A protein has these predicted regions:
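S-adenosyl-L-methionine
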Residues: 1-28, 38-45, 63
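Conserved glycine-rich SAM-binding loop
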Residues: 6, 35, 251-253
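SAM-dependent nucleic-acid methyltransferase catalytic core
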Residues: 11-13, 121-247, 251-260, 275-278, ...
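Conserved acidic residues
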Residues: 27, 244-245, 314
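SAM cofactor-binding core of SAM-dependent methyltransferases
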Residues: 27-92, 96, 137-139, 147-155, ...
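SAM-dependent methyltransferase catalytic-core segment centered on the flexible catalytic loop
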Residues: 253-312
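Conserved Class I SAM-dependent methyltransferase catalytic core
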Residues: 289-347
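Class I S-adenosyl-L-methionine
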Residues: 331-335, 342-386
Length: 386
């Protein structure tokens, strides 16, 4: 799935080898800001040790649980085939089907125009339904057809392998939405953006879910893991254990991640939300807030987390861009703070990271940066006070 600051490339540039080395001595692996879960999956598929995946957002927990909480492949395609057939029946019988047909007929086979997008928004706003995405995102991130497909798939989620099915749908939606970068705002129907909306709206959600479920089904963990939807600080203080290897990849944006992934969070929660603004955001109180994504509190949050870690017999691996980021943090700052409490080994790697959807004129969507990998160990002769 698309995810801001994914460690997929960094795993191939030294992080993976480092984790292999450190996991030999660790009792568990704890991924404190798991995001898309790529690091949790990397460890879970290679070591006979428990992986704990922690994140503030529910969609992250669902994605991680689909992989790390299962120790066998899902054989055959009966589950996903039965689910999609049930969703298609629901789609065919829903009253919104006629609205989708009305919109499709008005567009025809011609290329998409601004009036087509505005008509889609009008239709999805006018006809209130009990679906999760129809009124909130139809005509914006999703076409009317796609919004109805998502709602039908949510309504018909099977009880067996429900988490894996929901994870497949979240993954598909992340690759379907008509938005630059990471769904902070949908494309507006301008002349330049219309081709991107048209391309996104042509994607079939049913086909995408089938593809993504099969990808999830063939992967699993060696040992059944655990997911925690909650705050990293609270987990460290209350659930971290001596002997854990802790992976820390905190937010680097001064904008809350819940603003970029609210569409995925809505799908994960499977509940209707009232949205507003160009980004179609839920209310502020409904979006998880992290002190690490607030420029005024990020440094304090890092310091507090490091102090809590220093009270446990653990090894921590921290990754962060070397340069100053919009939340006021940098790899250098984190390293300097960590050296007050730990012996720190520093590794530098060139990597690219998302700028949250660049426009290629002011900035590219992805930029090269130097990423620091910091290994934190307790200082020799240090007395750990719990």
């Amino acid at each position: 799935m698309k995810y801001m600051g994914s460690k997929r490339k960094l795993l191939k540039k030294g992080l993976g080898d480092l984790l292999r080395q450190e996991m030999r001595k660790a009792s568990r692996f704890v991924d404190l800001f798991s995001g898309s879960g790529v690091v949790s999956r990397f460890v879970a598929s290679r070591f006979n040790k428990k992986v704990v995946s922690v994140d503030l957002q529910l969609f992250s927990s669902v994605i991680s649980a689909a992989y790390i909480c299962r120790t066998k492949k899902i054989k055959g395609s009966v589950i996903v085939d039965t689910w999609i057939e049930a969703a298609k029946r629901d789609y065919a019988s829903s009253r919104e089907r006629a609205i989708v047909d009305e919109w499709s007929d008005s567009c025809g086979d011609k290329k998409l125009f601004k009036k087509d997008v505005l008509f889609a928004r009008k239709l999805c706003a006018k006809h209130i339904c009990d679906g999760v995405t129809w009124n909130a995102y139809g005509g914006y991130y999703l076409s009317p057809r796609q919004a109805l497909q998502v709602d039908c798939l949510l309504r018909t989620l099977p009880s067996e392998f429900r988490t894996e099915c929901l994870a497949a749908l979240i993954s598909t939606v992340s690759k379907t939405v008509a938005a630059p970068g990471h769904t902070a705002q949908p494309f507006q129907p301008t002349r330049d953006a219309l081709p991107y909306i048209e391309e996104a709206w042509r994607r079939d959600v049913f086909c995408g879910v089938e593809r993504d479920f099969k990808e999830i089904a063939k992967r699993h963990s060696r040992v059944c893991g655990q997911v925690v939807c909650g705050d990293a600080q609270t987990f460290v203080e209350e659930q971290l254990q001596d002997g854990d290897l802790v992976f820390i990849d905190p937010p680097y944006s001064g904008v809350q991640y819940s603003r970029f992934y609210h569409v995925l969070e809505t799908v994960a929660k499977r509940t209707r939300v009232t949205v507003s603004g160009k980004g179609r955001y839920p209310s502020f109180v409904e979006r998880p807030q992290s002190a690490f994504s607030n420029k005024g509190t990020s440094e304090e949050a890092v310091g507090k987390l490091l102090v809590a870690l220093s009270k446990k017999r653990v090894v921590a691996v921290v990754t962060f861009p070397c340069e100053l980021c919009s939340n006021g943090l940098s790899g250098r700052k984190i390293g300097d703070e960590a050296r007050k409490l730990f012996e720190v080994t520093e590794i530098q790697r060139r990597n690219d990271f998302s700028t949250l959807g660049g426009n290629n004129t002011i900035r590219d969507a992805r930029q090269k940066t130097t990423e620091l990998i910091l290994v934190l160990r307790h200082k020799k002769h240090c007395v750990i006070k719990s």
